[in-house]
């Protein structure tokens, strides 16, 4: 983006009228100052030819090569993890009845063995990029499989996966193999040769856009108000801030406001020489924190690797020059770069420089069009209206990172037989491998279409599919996202038109959030509350679990009629009124007001409270026996409290078994929490080693199948069992797999007000 100091100035033409000496001196000083700050002068922008010359200015390739190496290396680590190579057989196993969510319905996964081949090609492409071996071909070998896998599954889309594809696309057109590459060893013309400035401009511009647009998106009122990541401040990383700030102020000032300021300013801080050290410090601290806060794979490390792109292009040579001479022999050359045909060299005194050729013109056009496109796409939602729900645009390319947090309270899928009219219900997520379809109209349409093709196998003819999905976004009321009266199989959906069956977000109720927080804080630890908002003419059918012995509904706004189904009674509630709900029965809540109704369920899980009291009594009894204050003998059924479960001994009661399980779990948590750093680091390494081991073994099996044919099912089962082994981990370690392969944190546990609440 910026041209660093040392740029050649354009010499004035000899036929121009000489100006007075003071004017020339003043102009020279101004030009030099502008070049020092921005890296270019106004004369570099005076004509298209000047712009082309500027963007193709010869630049040191060292910085670009370091980024190429680091980015490709991180992609090698990413492929088995977030790209899913280690669990590929679970996702694309042949013969599964699975509903998938590609960008285009024509996109289909290949048979499993061929999918492993696709990933192998992608891995080899990343390896070639890293080494600079057959560089251009390696970029293509990585890029095409990457975008195929990316477009194959919208449920895995996120901003950083999209960014990886963009960076790989950019590198494909760049001369990043002109330094520290195998190609340079094999081809003298590419070894230590200049690269055009636009190679850096595109990459710097991309990273600048990621930061700045992310900051602009955080100007959203929810982010500024501190609602987007409200609970993040509970993480131990924010403990130093909580020494001087409350948790609420830490969330508002540190998480939200500082995050906003950093995103808005990071690109500018990195751009200018004077502020770059400050920018490098803060963005490095920011990404190191993110690596611990979120399961986002290689993203923090890719951003850390991109930060030096803003530094002087020759910084790797300066670093090599400071190394011991013996070490310098193993490192890339520190010699000055050589001329390259990819660059345009300014004319020297008395000589006319070469004019920019077609390749130089194309490089400049690519740079300008690409950056303009990247500035436009995050705001192109008016074109892709079908993807707009409560948030705008296709998820993943708008850079609205962490701005919206959702909680799903209730999901119900109803099917109706088109011939008999028979109604039935499906488990949410049946025939899928993801939960993300619940938030997006395009995926819901794909899911309904898929279900309509699968249900006839289960004697459901011409199925109609209805979804009742309740979502809260950024701590608002739980409300319906889609119209539950619409058959989504027959519903109209277009990527370029607004989806009519998406319910609007009730923004008018946003000010209620402060009051809702006050209500929550006023309740005791055993009392739970769920806040509901519903549209006129709709109703909620709900079931109160028998465990909830004390459940009431209270109206906050509007007017509702509550029907107790078993008792065949109706009661209308006005604002502020409430009524008790019987446990173990269904009820319906009808919104009869002309405006949306708001109400809340307040309930106590009496079964859970009783269990907690019993467990607390057992814990107290155990402590009394251990410290000698309880001298009487324990009943036989309580002996396991002291001795644990003994084979052949008395059978513990269910309560004692629950107590012992909890004790073991708490002890394991405490052991892991207090384990020394080297043990935790070893566990981390062993988990990653398992991921890479399984990726390699399963890939070897599939490539063998393609080359030699599949062996017997018995042999395949033995080979897969061997691939699933964890030979490096201690026996007592848990068998949790691929902690980094998921980009989405688990949702909160469902409540008990409904079978799915």
From Swiss-Prot:
Membrane topology value: Multi-pass membrane protein
SS bond partners: 99-450
Chemical reaction(s) catalysed: 4-carboxy-L-glutamyl-[protein] + 2,3-epoxyphylloquinone + H2O + H(+) = phylloquinol + L-glutamyl-[protein] + CO2 + O2
Basic and acidic residues bias (residue ranges): 746-757
Residues in compartment: Lumenal: 82-113, 158-292, 383-757
Residue intervals on the Cytoplasmic side: 2-60, 135-136, 314-361
Entry keyword annotation includes Endoplasmic reticulum: yes
Composition skew (Polar residues), residue ranges: 734-745
Modified residues (N-acetylalanine): 2
GO biological process, one term: protein maturation
Main location: endoplasmic reticulum
Functional summary from the UniProt entry: Mediates the vitamin K-dependent carboxylation of glutamate residues to calcium-binding gamma-carboxyglutamate (Gla) residues with the concomitant conversion of the reduced hydroquinone form of vitamin K to vitamin K epoxide. Catalyzes gamma-carboxylation of various proteins, such as blood coagulation factors (F2, F7, F9 and F10), osteocalcin (bglap and bglap2) or matrix Gla protein (MGP).
Family assignment from sequence similarity: Belongs to the vitamin K-dependent gamma-carboxylase family.
Quaternary assembly: Monomer. May interact with CALU.
Name of the protein this chain belongs to: Vitamin K-dependent gamma-carboxylase
Organism: Mus musculus (Mouse)
Underlying gene: Ggcx
């Amino acid at each position: 983006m910026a041209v660093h100091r040392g740029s050649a100035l354009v010499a004035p033409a000899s036929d121009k009228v000489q100006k007075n000496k003071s004017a020339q001196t003043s102009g020279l000083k101004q030009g030099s100052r502008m070049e020092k700050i921005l890296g270019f002068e106004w004369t570099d922008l005076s004509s298209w030819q000047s712009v082309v010359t500027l963007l193709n200015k010869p630049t040191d390739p060292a910085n670009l090569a370091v980024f190429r190496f680091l980015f490709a290396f991180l992609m090698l680590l990413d492929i088995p993890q977030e790209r899913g190579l280690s669990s590929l057989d679970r996702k694309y196993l042949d013969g599964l009845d699975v509903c998938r969510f590609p960008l285009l319905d024509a996109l289909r996964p290949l048979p499993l063995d061929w999918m492993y081949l696709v990933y192998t090609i992608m891995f080899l492409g990343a390896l070639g990029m890293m080494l600079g071996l057959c560089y251009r071909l390696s970029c293509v070998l990585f890029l095409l499989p990457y975008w195929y896998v990316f477009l194959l599954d919208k449920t895995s889309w996120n901003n950083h996966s999209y960014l990886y594809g963009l960076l790989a696309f950019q590198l494909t057109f760049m001369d990043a193999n002109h330094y520290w590459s195998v190609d340079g060893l094999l081809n003298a013309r590419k070894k230590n040769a200049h690269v055009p400035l636009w190679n850096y401009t595109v990459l710097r511009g991309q990273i600048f856009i990621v930061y700045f647009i992310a900051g602009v998106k955080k100007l959203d009122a929810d982010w500024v108000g501190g609602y987007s990541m409200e609970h993040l401040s509970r993480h131990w990383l924010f403990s130093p801030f909580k020494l001087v700030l409350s948790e609420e102020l830490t969330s508002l000032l540190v998480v939200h406001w500082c995050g906003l300021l950093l995103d808005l300013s990071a690109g500018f801080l990195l751009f200018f020489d004077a502020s770059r050290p400050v920018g490098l410090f803060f963005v490095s601290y920011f990404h190191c924190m993110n690596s611990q806060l979120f399961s986002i794979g290689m993203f923090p490390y890719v951003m850390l690797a991109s930060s030096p792109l803003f530094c002087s292009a020759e910084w790797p040579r300066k670093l090599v020059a400071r190394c011991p001479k013996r070490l310098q022999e193993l490192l890339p050359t520190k010699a000055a770069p050589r001329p390259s045909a990819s660059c345009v060299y300014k004319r020297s005194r008395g000589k006319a420089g070469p004019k920019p050729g077609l390749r130089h013109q194309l490089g400049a056009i690519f740079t300008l069009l690409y950056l303009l496109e990247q500035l436009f796409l995050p705001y192109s939602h008016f074109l892709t209206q079908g993807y707009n729900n409560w948030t705008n645009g296709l998820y993943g390319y708008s850079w609205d990172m962490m701005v919206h947090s959702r909680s799903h309270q209730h999901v119900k899928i109803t099917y109706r037989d088109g011939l008999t009219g028979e109604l039935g219900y499906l488990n949410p997520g049946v025939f899928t491998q993801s939960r993300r379809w619940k938030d997006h109209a395009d995926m819901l349409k794909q899911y309904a279409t898929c279900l309509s093709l699968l249900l006839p196998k289960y004697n459901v003819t011409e199925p109609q599919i209805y979804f009742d999905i309740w979502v809260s976004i950024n701590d608002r009321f739980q409300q319906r996202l889609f119209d539950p009266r619409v058959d989504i199989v027959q519903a109209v959906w277009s990527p370029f038109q607004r989806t009519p069956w998406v319910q609007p977000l009730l923004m008018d109720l946003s000010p209620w959030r402060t009051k809702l927080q006050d209500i929550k804080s006023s309740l005791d630890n055993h009392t739970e509350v769920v806040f509901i908002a519903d549209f006129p003419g709709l109703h909620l059918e709900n079931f109160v679990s028998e465990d909830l012995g004390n459940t009431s509904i209270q109206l906050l706004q509007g007017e509702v009629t509550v029907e107790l189904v078993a008792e065949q009674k109706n009661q209308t509630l006005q604002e502020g009124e409430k009524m008790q709900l019987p446990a173990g029965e269904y009820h319906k809540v009808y919104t009869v007001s002309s405006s949306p109704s708001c109400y809340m369920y307040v309930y106590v899980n009496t079964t859970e409270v009783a269990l907690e009291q019993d467990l607390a009594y057992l814990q107290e009894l155990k402590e009394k026996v251990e410290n000698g204050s309880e001298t009487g003998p324990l009943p036989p059924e309580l002996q396991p409290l002291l001795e644990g479960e003994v084979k052949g001994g008395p059978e513990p009661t269910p309560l004692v078994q629950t107590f012992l399980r909890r004790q073991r779990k708490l002890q394991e948590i405490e052991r892991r929490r207090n384990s020394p750093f080297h043990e935790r680091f070893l566990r981390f390494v062993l988990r990653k080693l398992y991921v890479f081991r399984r990726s390699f073994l399963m890939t070897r099996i599939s490539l063998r199948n393609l080359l030699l044919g599949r062996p017997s099912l018995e042999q395949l089962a033995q080979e897969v069992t061997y691939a699933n082994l964890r030979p490096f981990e201690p026996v007592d370690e848990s068998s949790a797999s691929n902690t980094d392969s998921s980009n989405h944190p688990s949702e909160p546990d469902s409540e008990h007000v409904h079978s799915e609440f």
